[in-house]
Amino acid sequence: MPSVSRAVCVQRASGNNGRRCRDGAAAAGRRSVVAQRARHGKPEVAIRSGSGGSARGGHCSPLRAVAAPIPTTKKRVFHFGKGKSEGNKAMKDLLGGKGANLAEMASIGLSVPPGFTVSTEACQQYQAAGKTLPAGLWEEIVEGLQWVEEYMAARLGDPARPLLLSVRSGAAVSMPGMMDTVLNLGLNDEVAAGLAAKSGDRFAYDSYRRFLDMFGNVVMDIPHALFEEKLEAMKAVKGLHNDTDLTATDLKELVAQYKDVYVEAKGEPFPSDPKKQLQLAVLAVFNSWDSPRAIKYRSINKITGLKGTAVNVQTMVFGNMGNTSGTGVLFTRNPSTGEKKLYGEFLVNAQGEDVVAGIRTPEDLDAMRDHMPEPYEELVENCKILESHYKEMMDIEFTVQENRLWMLQCRTGKRTGKGAVKIAVDMVNEGLVERRTALKMVEPGHLDQLLHPQFENPSGYKDKVIATGLPASPGAAVGQIVFTAEDAEAWHAQGKDVILVRTETSPEDVGGMHAAVGILTARGGMTSHAAVVARGWGKCCVSGCSSVRVNDASKIVVIEDKALHEGEWLSLNGSTGEVIIGKQPLCPPALSGDLETFMSWVDEVRKLKVMANADTPEDATTARQNGAEGIGLCRTEHMFFASDERIKAVRQMIMASSLELRQKALDRLLPYQRSDFEGIFRAMDGLPVTIRLLDPPLHEFLPEGHVEDMVRELCSETGAAQDDVLARVEKLSEVNPMLGFRGCRLGISYPELTEMQARAIFEAAITMTNQGIQVFPEIMVPLVGTPQELGHQVDVIRQIANKVFTDMGKTIGYKVGTMIEIPRAALVADEIAEQAEFFSFGTNDLTQMTFGYSRDDVGKFLPIYLSQGILQHDPFEVLDQRGVGELVKLATERGRKARPNLKVGICGEHGGEPLSVAFFAKAGLDYVSCSPFRVPIARLAAAQVLL
């Protein structure tokens, strides 16, 4: 049994490389805390923060109390322990997810080490006060500390009765690895000596050197590599391979060397006063909120509206006190597959960061059952309690100290798309949740993952498998090797697919991880930083591949006996852990029966229809398979590029010097267009198909290259004289083509162009109708800015319709409408609705023209705008609700005043973006239209807005 001084330090956590931190929290378990204390002595305290930000930049300036804004909530420090807490799981906004769940676990009687949480509002006040602690906060923190000291009968800084703390962050939204944990806070020379007298030299000085490393890196911003160099040098001198082989004498020497690092790196000694350590750690947590990696993580995941991070200060328990101690991470169900079975990893005689950072290779959770049967049984029971209580799949961190189980953290577990759908369906079938609740358990992005490709023939590449690691995040990825996050982002910006190869990842790598199609790491388990982040994003990831040796400096990775350089192709199977040399072919994934069940529940709830943007029969078929209720945008110009003959006919039409020559070229195009429309009508039998007339500027159909080459090619294709072709090309040249001769302006200038397209549509529709296909054509006129423009095109279309109906002896129903993509059209929507039977918002161009941003040039300044908070989102990805959204609402209202039965939808890129879909549903639109593969995402988003 440990003596009182053996700190009950729950060391669960992210260490130096931005790893996910794990720590202990405060609450007595089903066994009373009093009994625990009697048996196991007094735990030490652990401090954690509750945010998702990086923990850089605490620095050494002392805390200064200054006047601060009046807090929204007067109480800013909330303690937990003794089987009851001052907070609960509903207080995530105030306590952060970590703090709220620690309080909840303590309240329901689980074994949680005691501690306190500093609220997110305190962080908000700190930021508002120019990064100065608000008045009175430090005194409140000291009171919280005294409460813990009194309960534990131990004191921070007391060598005889040492209390050690862990400090971590925890915002309302989980952001793995964004803030590193500080463990063993409170150690100095005197406390370490006192701890050694009661718990042994090796344990005390191993804890001390770990604390010096973590505190220096996380709080003082000293590079972890400086400490790592000292450690590796000592092991080399001693001829040792593992950290655990170092003796107590070695560790004492290492402590002295680590303290020298502080002087060398910062010009000042390590702060030995434990309360000063606590002050600086709290500052580091608060400062982590707006660190570059925290900002990037929130930007990537579109996380906005949070107050800040909480700080969790908690009594520590130790998993590194011998073979009856250990630490682990688990999910109550398999996060990759959704299988109802505990899934996790465990390490005997280890601290939490050893699991998540890949410092040691962990064992499967089943190994714990053999090593520690009693704590394992209690853990299994706790998992059942938590899953039943939260009605969710949970991510749990725990430590066993000398056969005593401590629950350190629980939160809703991140999962893959496949796992999310299965868990939701299974929990409904188990009677644990209602269907509507299950719909909220799956994110739209999860469905995106399910639609990612898999390998075409897994058995065909077996001879090319060069290594096998852990299957950390499922799916398949094929890309070119890069070794840094910066290179991954740069190559991705050039349109290249890349595989990010690292020894291990850290939160600094999140930008590159997001840019990569797949991630391969040499170290780290199934719950490492790389694995957790990759699963959350649906990225293929193979981790813990021990045969991988990365040389970042030379940009070479050696796998077994093969040396691969930057830019070489590599394939990853995240479902099996296989690393395959070369570029393996991919195919679309097969969708599960669980997804079909889940999507049927989605469709029972949603009211907004979901259509698809599809230009070919193949696209239309895919869209229908994914649940599209019609085609909301069929772009006719894409059909012109389908063959050389077609594009030559288009160019002849463009180069035509007379109506006769132009009509001749259009007559050649007519059968091509008619055939394409027949295929699409056939694929969408019984569903509406909205066909947009020609929209792009004519110059887009001309050959690329130098003018001389272009003229030579056009002369060859059209037989026209060189001077005539050159004059025509110069006439087509425009200063700003996106605002130039395009859309309905083409159809008005060349009515025969609209006539040809309308004839192709109506002839195809009647032909299909005669074959028993139900056809509902809708013709959409693009780039309308005045009712007169639309009126002109409507007249042309209806005249052709009547001619075709007469010639073919059959009449069919059809609609004529317009795209609303010019701000003026939105403002005069009531007048336009007199001619239009439907509106479809082209939000791509509407965004361009409303902001005055060119999509082709926005990349020059948009990253700056996003990083400085001038814009919260890329407006071409997420609809600008305040500006563009207001035009959408205004046009819808005015249009329906003039035509009450006006059908209104949207066909821009925003049609598949969840936040935008939710807005369109609330705005009263009838449908959204998006790419075929985003149809399930839009369906779910349309349902979730009603929950």
Swiss-Prot record:
It catalyses: pyruvate + phosphate + ATP = phosphoenolpyruvate + AMP + diphosphate + H(+). Residues 39-60 are annotated as: Disordered. Residues 1-71 form a transit peptide. Substrate binds at R635, R692, E821, G842, T843, N844, D845. Its cofactor is Mg(2+). Keywords: ATP-binding, Chloroplast, Cytoplasm, Kinase, Magnesium, Metal-binding, Nucleotide-binding, Phosphoprotein, Photosynthesis, Plastid, Pyruvate, Transferase, Transit peptide. The keyword Cytoplasm applies. Its main location: plastid. SUPFAM superfamilies: Glutathione synthetase ATP-binding domain-like (SSF56059), Phosphoenolpyruvate/pyruvate domain (SSF51621), Phosphohistidine domain (SSF52009). One of its GO terms (biological process) is photosynthesis. Mg(2+) binds at E821, D845. Activated by light-induced dephosphorylation. Inhibited by dark-induced phosphorylation. Both reactions are catalyzed by PDRP1. Its EC number is 2.7.9.1. Isoform 1 is only expressed in green leaves. Isoform 2 is found in roots, stems, rachis branches, leaf sheaths, green leaves and spikelets. The non-phosphorylated PPDK in mature seeds is endosperm-localized. One of its GO terms (cellular component) is cytosol. The modification Phosphothreonine is found at T527. It is found in: Plastid, Chloroplast; Cytoplasm. The active site is at H529, C907. Formation of phosphoenolpyruvate. The cytoplasmic isoform supports the biosynthetic processes in the nascent endosperm and provides an efficient mechanism for glycolytic ATP synthesis in oxygen depleted tissues. May be involved in regulating the flux of carbon into starch and fatty acids of seeds and in the remobilization of nitrogen reserves in senescing leaves. The N-terminal domain contains the ATP/Pi binding site, the central domain the pyrophosphate/phosphate carrier histidine, and the C-terminal domain the pyruvate binding site. The reaction takes place in three steps, mediated by a phosphocarrier histidine residue located on the surface of the central domain. The two first partial reactions are catalyzed at an active site located on the N-terminal domain, and the third partial reaction is catalyzed at an active site located on the C-terminal domain. For catalytic turnover, the central domain swivels from the concave surface of the N-terminal domain to that of the C-terminal domain. This is Pyruvate, phosphate dikinase 1, chloroplastic. It comes from Oryza sativa subsp. japonica.
